[in-house]
Amino acid sequence: DTSQLFPLVKESGFDMVECFATDPLAKCTLEDARAAWGTSIIIWGGVPSVVLEEWYPAEQFESHIRDLFRTIAPGDAFIMGVSDNVMPGAEVWRLERIAELVEQHGYYPIRN
């Protein structure tokens, strides 16, 4: 559970975490990280690779990405990316959909 490391990350003086994995891949959420760090630590990630897989329900994928935009609004201290790796089983249309949503909603400041 990555959330157990939140206080240590903040105390360490790091100003960014990269490859930040969240639910459903890890037992923490982006909301948890924001509550712990605010915008004092830049988060790079937020898109768990499992949401790109064929077996992950398309409706949940769409919901996850839309919720991501709501959580990061207005967009301070966040760089969207796949939090681990794009795996061979990833569906390309899902990456294309993320790109579409970034084009539609990814301008600063992000509005809910």
Residue ranges and their predicted role:
Residues 1-112:
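Active-site loop segments of alpha/beta catalytic cores
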